[in-house]
Amino acid sequence: MKTVTQTLNVALGERSYPIHIGTDVLSRPELILPFLSQKRVVVVTNTSVAPLYLDELRSGLEKCGIETLPVVLPDGEQYKTWETLNLIFDALLAARCERNTTLIALGGGVIGDMGGFAAACYQRGMPFIQVPTTLLSQVDSSVGGKTAINHPMGKNMVGAFYQPRLVLADLSTLDTLPDRELKAGLAEVIKYGLIRDPDFFVWLEANLEKLLVRDKSALAYAVHRSCANKAEVVAADERESGERALLNLGHTFGHAIETGLGYGEWLHGEAVAAGTLIAAELSCRLGWIDADSVARIEKIFVRSGLPVKAPDLGAARYLELMSHDKKVQDGKLRLVLLREIGKAVVSDAATTAQMVDAIEARCT
């Protein structure tokens, strides 16, 4: 049954755009057609998603007279590179795509990030649409206009803020999502409860098992509430000069894990979960949250099947990797920490010694 369960709006003035969340909406081209500037689109996807959903998306568009050019990339965080990005540019140039050709990113966070960055760069900007197919991308990375590729020295270090024209989140794509990917997506869902929505955190504690068994109504609620939180934050602080930085809870430590282990060894959500526990540990050591709160946070990640212990890269290696973090200001590392469950702050209050202690306490 094709249904749009909810539509949200990311309010950015002339660059505002809708988020359609529904079931079997990939085959509803009428949701996409109003956002196309010409009768040709490029669909950037990967080798895992293409066999599942590319034909469904293409057939609906082609029945409406829209020519589709697929660009199928290798799957994995390790391919979020200049080399893979250039494959997109090669395809765009070979097909003589124009500035008003629309690029559709069909896939998870890696495809959305790379497709969006390619769109931001090609002929100095072409329109693009996000069609996220993983829980993580539906609740987080597809909304807000962050696009990037990785660098050997740090994750998402080369990129741009570039907003999509539309986000189309089809909950049906979660049916084929591997369990590990579903669990990884829950890390970003839980994040919203921790940083700004304590009632949502309570709901997640009560409904986590429903999400793990892919209950459609529970997933629809979680995706909608996560996107509503993200849309509010992005509308207030598009370029991450203030409140938007709070969305990076667990990410400073998490990005260090991903870079230190090698891209693709841990999924992004897995690294964020372990990183969030380090941040919670540090918040506790600063006297901002109590040990019971840390235990409560750890419990929901354990129930989600996510790692709560970080890999032992060595505290010095963590600090080295974190020194490249995008929140560093005047050479000083700023971290997203918790004042309570449901309230986060960006702070440079932690000393190096306190960071080391927290890292060592949460490493295996």
From Swiss-Prot:
InterPro entries: Dehydroquinate_synthase, DHQ_synth_AroB, DHQ_synth_fam, DHQS/DOIS_N, DHQS_C. Keywords: Amino-acid biosynthesis, Aromatic amino acid biosynthesis, Cobalt, Cytoplasm, Lyase, Metal-binding, NAD, Nucleotide-binding, Zinc. It catalyses: 7-phospho-2-dehydro-3-deoxy-D-arabino-heptonate = 3-dehydroquinate + phosphate. GO terms for cellular component: cytoplasm. Zn(2+) binds at E188, H251, H268. It holds the Pfam family DHQS_C. Signal peptide: none annotated. GO terms for molecular function: 3-dehydroquinate synthase activity; metal ion binding; nucleotide binding. GO terms for biological process: amino acid biosynthetic process; aromatic amino acid family biosynthetic process; chorismate biosynthetic process. Its cofactor is Co(2+); Zn(2+); NAD(+). NAD(+) binds at residues 75-80, 109-113, 133-134, 146, 155, 173-176. It is found in: Cytoplasm. Its EC number is 4.2.3.4. SUPFAM superfamilies: Dehydroquinate synthase-like. Coiled coil: none annotated. Binds 1 divalent metal cation per subunit. Can use either Co(2+) or Zn(2+). Pathway: Metabolic intermediate biosynthesis; chorismate biosynthesis; chorismate from D-erythrose 4-phosphate and phosphoenolpyruvate: step 2/7. Belongs to the sugar phosphate cyclases superfamily. Dehydroquinate synthase family. HAMAP family: DHQ_synthase. Catalyzes the conversion of 3-deoxy-D-arabino-heptulosonate 7-phosphate (DAHP) to dehydroquinate (DHQ). This is 3-dehydroquinate synthase. It comes from Dechloromonas aromatica (strain RCB). The gene is aroB.
